């Protein structure tokens, strides 16, 4: 199932509903008595909920039905907040509790810059025409790594001020440049150190890799666009 998880690209694409068992709609399982059956939330729900983490002790999962979503036309409206010390970070975390239960908010994340500064990302999934303040657009021939954009364009060089407090980024670009897609993993791999040190390598890979080649699952957008959903097995 590891190959299927990676192939569908649903293992970690959402901070909210990222794991395969949170994404799956049905399992086709061969039980220990060699009987093949389909498990869903509505049918055999007790066994369905036991499958994740059972390590094949219940049965062998041979197929999974998942929900996929077309990302065209979806954007992430991102608000940035900067905390310069631990006290400010704790105050920011406390203030973010008011966002709990807000269906508009897809995720809240904290990234650290140079081990000291903390940038909070409050991401809201939207379905709109291309905003005028978009950072990434598909007609641009060069795209930054997201964290490069964050550390150089969003936060000032001295790390003490936000240069951009709010922006919109095309969802497939946000997921592809920031989330655990191939681009992010390759760049963070110590064995691929040359990607960090040579600008022409970032240029080369940034030009060659396109977000349209990577299908991503995002439950937050599925709440607003039912017509774009389908199931794949």
What are the functions of these language-model segments?
Residues 1-233:
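Noncatalytic alpha-helical scaffold of FAD-dependent oxidoreductases
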């Amino acid at each position: 199932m590891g190959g299927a998880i990676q192939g569908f690209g649903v293992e970690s694409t959402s901070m909210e509903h990222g794991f395969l068992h949170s994404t799956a709609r049905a399992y086709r399982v061969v039980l220990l008595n060699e009987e093949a059956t389909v498990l869903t939330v509505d049918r055999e729900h007790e066994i369905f909920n036991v499958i994740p983490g059972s390590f094949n002790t219940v049965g062998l999962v041979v197929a999974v039905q998942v929900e996929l979503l077309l990302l065209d036309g979806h954007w992430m409206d991102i608000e940035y907040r900067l905390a310069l010390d631990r006290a400010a970070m704790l105050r920011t975390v406390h203030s973010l509790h008011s966002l709990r239960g807000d269906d508009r908010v897809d995720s809240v994340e904290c990234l650290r810059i140079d081990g000291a500064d903390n940038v909070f990302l409050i991401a809201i999934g939207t379905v709109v025409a291309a905003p005028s303040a978009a950072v990434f657009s598909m007609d641009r021939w060069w795209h930054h790594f997201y964290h490069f954009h964050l550390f150089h364009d969003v936060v000032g060089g001295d790390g003490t001020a936000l240069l951009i407090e709010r922006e919109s980024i095309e969802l497939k670009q946000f997921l592809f440049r920031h989330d655990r897609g191939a681009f992010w993993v390759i760049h963070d791999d110590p064995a691929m150190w040359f990607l960090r040190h040579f600008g022409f390598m970032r240029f080369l890979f940034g030009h060659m890799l396109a977000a349209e080649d990577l299908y991503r699952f995002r439950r937050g957008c599925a709440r607003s666009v039912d017509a774009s959903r389908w199931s794949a097995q």
